[in-house]
């Protein structure tokens, strides 16, 4: 139950009358510890304590060095406050709490105020290959101006190829896979049932023939089940959010692969997709 001012006054009055703390706590339905807190403050000041949201310690003023440090780190990595806290600790050996960082991001205009309180996230089971290049996810995406083709390594989340085209075609899909193959031998390719990847008539296509020629097994997602290709779908959200910050796609690819830590990887050491790609590379016999 909530401790209101009328209940607080009644609780203190009963304590003055000789009630025990256990008896007085039942008036407002609060803990014995809380009754002792307000009773001790009343005895020290001889006044009914103020209660409410705005009676705590005043917020500490944000200093300029904190603003500069958060701005510099965000513009370099473009990640959430929780990740920025770790990056600032690593890069500058300074500690700024993530709640304070979020407050600074709001001031700088790099974040939006949340409309509701965060809900604690549940742990989830993540399905991924153990080794790099065991499987890749591919798909097309239209951002309103450009057709985007991406090849994402399943194990490391590394972006192996990125094309920005004026149309989504089989030829461009093959071109994108050829770029990805420059990273090494790919075993499996996971895609949806897009016309660029299969034939709607008999299931055969030039793209499928290309994969067979390269010794790559094609795995098709279940129809109307985008979660099967969720890694690349989630990556397109990152593309839409951050691509406009970079002048060229090469700069964007370098930022994503080599600078931005990925939470699905070894986050304790702020591992990037490029680092995970090397770590998870299977040693050849």
What are the language-model segments listed below?
Residues 2-19, 67-76:
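Short, amphipathic alpha-helical "recognition" segments used to contact nucleic acids or chromatin
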Residues 177, 181-201, 222-224, 229, ...:
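Acidic/histidine-rich, metal-coordinating catalytic segments
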Residues 214, 237-285:
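C-terminal domain-tail junction helix/linker
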Residues 22, 33-36, 99:
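Key DNA-contact positions within bacterial/archaeal DNA-binding proteins
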Residues 94-95, 99, 103-158, 166, ...:
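Mobile-element integrase/transposase regions
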Residues 23-28, 84:
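Short alpha-helical "recognition helix" segments of helix-turn-helix
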Residues 49-69, 73-135, 205, 272-278:
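Basic, flexible linker segments flanking DNA-binding modules
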Residues 197-241, 273-275:
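RNase H-like two-metal-ion nuclease catalytic core shared by retroviral integrases
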């Amino acid at each position: 139950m909530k401790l209101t001012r009328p209940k607080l006054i009644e609780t203190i009055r009963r304590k003055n009358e000789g009630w025990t703390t256990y008896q007085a706590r039942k008036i407002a339905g609060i803990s014995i510890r809380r009754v002792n807190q307000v009773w001790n403050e009343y005895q020290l000041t001889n006044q009914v304590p103020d209660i409410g949201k705005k009676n705590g310690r005043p917020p500490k003023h944000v200093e300029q060095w904190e603003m500069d440090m958060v701005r510099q780190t965000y513009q370099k990595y473009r990640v959430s406050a929780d990740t920025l806290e770790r990056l600032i600790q690593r890069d500058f050996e300074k500690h700024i709490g993530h709640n304070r960082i979020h407050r600074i991001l709001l001031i700088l205009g790099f974040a939006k105020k949340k409309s509701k309180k965060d809900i604690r996230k549940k742990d989830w089971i993540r399905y991924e290959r153990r080794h790099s290049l065991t499987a890749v996810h591919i798909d097309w995406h239209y951002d309103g101006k450009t057709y985007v083709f991406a090849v994402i390594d399943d194990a490391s989340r590394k972006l192996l190829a990125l094309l920005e085209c004026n149309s989504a075609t089989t030829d461009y899909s093959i071109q994108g896979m050829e770029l990805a193959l420059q990273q090494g031998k790919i075993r499996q390719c996971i895609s949806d049932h897009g016309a660029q990847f299969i034939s709607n008539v008999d299931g055969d296509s030039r793209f499928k023939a290309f994969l067979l020629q390269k010794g790559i097994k094609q795995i098709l997602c279940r129809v109307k089940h985008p979660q099967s290709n969720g890694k690349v779908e989630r990556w397109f959200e990152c593309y839409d959010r951050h691509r406009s910050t970079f002048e060229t796609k090469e700069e964007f690819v370098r930022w994503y692969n080599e600078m931005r830590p990925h939470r699905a990887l070894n986050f304790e050491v702020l591992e990037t997709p490029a680092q995970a790609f090397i770590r998870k590379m299977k040693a050849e016999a």
